[in-house]
Amino acid sequence: MKSQIQVLLLFFIITVGYSQPKLSFDLGLGLYQPSLTGYDENEIFPIKNTLNRNLLFNWGVYYEFFYNARIGISTLTSIDSKDSKNFTLDNQSSADFSRRITYRFFPIETFFRWKPRIEINFTLMPIWGRSTISLETNPPQQLDDWKSFLTMFSDTEIGLSEMNATDNMVSNWYGYGSMLGFRFYLTSRMAFDLKSGFMNNTYDEKLWYLRGNKVTGPKMKIDGLPIFSLKILYGLR
């Protein structure tokens, strides 16, 4: 009886040990090629290049809830900016400009070990996208500066009577995507992960909000985009 209890206890310990989910954190870079015509058609915006147009900064956290499946959250962010010395509005005023496009993924990932160090994975991911445009203007002309800025995208008058020296306009949208990945384990906890796939986004330039008021923002074609990512990850058992 004692030996049977010992065997059952050993089996329980092994089962619990192997069934514990794994938590992993990753950092990396993404690459894609959007069509941001709303920025390209206006010369005051920074000239497009690989850093401000194609490169995405990536971080993510994944939770292994089954022996061959993970869920998590991952973000890819594009950043652009221009200081007031080089950013002059049509009303001859200057401002500090910054722009972010962030794609928040909520991935469901399945995987299998092809070899001890090599993993093949497939990811499906709902997307919550957000873009933010910020202007840091000089009081007391911040309202005029914002009006001048928005005329680059639309002739519609905004219904605002005041603005802060630093303010921003925001747009949110939803989308989906999928990716096929290859992972190489350097150790049992550290690995490189290379993925490629596509994403579709339902962005609408007419659905921007500035201090609660709906405004028109830049035209961006970010649907049907191929996307690549390379990241390094560390797993916590």
Regions found by a protein language model. Name each.
Residues 34-40, 80-86, 131-137, 202-207, ...:
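Outer-membrane beta-barrel proteins
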Residues 19-74, 233-237:
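Short glycine/proline- and aromatic-enriched beta-strand/turn motifs that initiate or cap beta-hairpins
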Residues 21-23, 51-57, 95-104, 118, ...:
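Residues that define the transmembrane beta-barrel architecture of outer-membrane proteins
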Residues 4-15:
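Sec-dependent N-terminal signal peptides
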Residues 41-49, 89-97, 162-168, 213-220:
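Extracellular loop and loop/strand-boundary signature of outer-membrane beta-barrel proteins
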Residues 173, 178-237:
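Predominantly the C-terminal beta-signal and adjacent terminal strand-loop region
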Residues 60-156, 184-189, 223-237:
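Gram-negative (and chloroplast) outer-membrane scaffold detector with strong preference
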Residues 1-5, 20:
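Positively charged n-region of N-terminal signal peptides that target proteins for export
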